[in-house]
Amino acid sequence: MFDVLMYLFETYIHTEAELRVDQDKLEQDLTDAGFDREDIYNALLWLEKLADYQEGLAEPMQLASDPLSMRIYTPEECERLDASCRGFLLFLEQIQVLNLETREMVIERVLALDNAEFELDDLKWVILMVLFNIPGCENAYQQMEELLFEVNEGMLH
């Protein structure tokens, strides 16, 4: 499913291609690209749930907003998000790329993935997808995009 999401993000969303694509045509394009129907269905469902945030149909878990509070991860979250992923989320909060709400959206979307393995690079792409879809997060999206591509080029300052 994550491969389908990456393909969709890079092909349709990130490239600013026509975003209003007929779902049947999209499913056929993905099938023609070699993706499994179940993975396609799960990826589209994942994106629909993400769109619910954008449309205000869903809200992330509301947590205490005390700046001195610390996010405690559940065992399920720790299983999916290793120490490097959790540290990266904290780093993004500290540099104000993520806030409490967007962090919770990211965690919820990560837990909704069906990947057996999940790494820091995967998390970075999920963060980009979430920030891209949330109104008012354009600057955070741009910062995250810069971080992603600077790290990939080995030039993180």
UniProtKB/Swiss-Prot annotation:
Cysteine disulfide partners in this protein: none
Domain of life: Bacteria
UniProt xrefs under InterPro entries: Smg
Record-stated family: Belongs to the Smg family.
HAMAP family to which the protein is assigned, alphabetical: Smg
Protein's name according to its UniProt entry: Protein Smg
Species assigned in the record: Escherichia coli (strain SE11)
